[in-house]
């Protein structure tokens, strides 16, 4: 899998004597979680994992060289059952996903580390990551953190409709890959589909509302796309990568500085 994580930040490139010598109380380990799942006719199955590698790798490049932060290898298989029925989607159950994160967390604690951040870029994992960040704190006393997607950055120049409902293989994901891995984007195969209209607020929304309906992609988007990839440009992808990486780097630095109240 292509990655932008600097070699010097890869936990798995250390040997055990180097791990033993790390400052365990201060070191922050980051566990990326993503997916291998359909992303329409134009983006690869690995889109969420590539975006995770891209944004985290760029953020890690921005940290001071002596900041003790290492990226664990990603959990590439996520809970993607919303995308079942499309060839290529590899989904694990919620129980399996949580068990893997729990056992990696146990190994982090057993190795003597204290700080662990979960960095997730697949929406179907988000509620599980939230649960696991708390459970790892409770079960192992780890100082856990959860970090999602762009780190909260509002990407410039995205329409209100796309911002609300372009959440799968739409403009943002397409732009990020156009800038980072253009050979993996088939610009002749764009499809457009919106699950709801931002101009017509409904009582039941698909996401981010107090009252929602639970959707499967095959119910609402035959091509597998929810959003509009057509406005995506490599230039915006590069700009948004930089914006997100800066925000993620700030979050990682705050996690490094974090001290629990005595
Ligand atoms: Zn995606």
Residue ranges and their predicted role:
Residues 1-115, 123-262:
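Extended, histidine- and acidic-residue-enriched regions that form the cofactor-binding/catalytic faces
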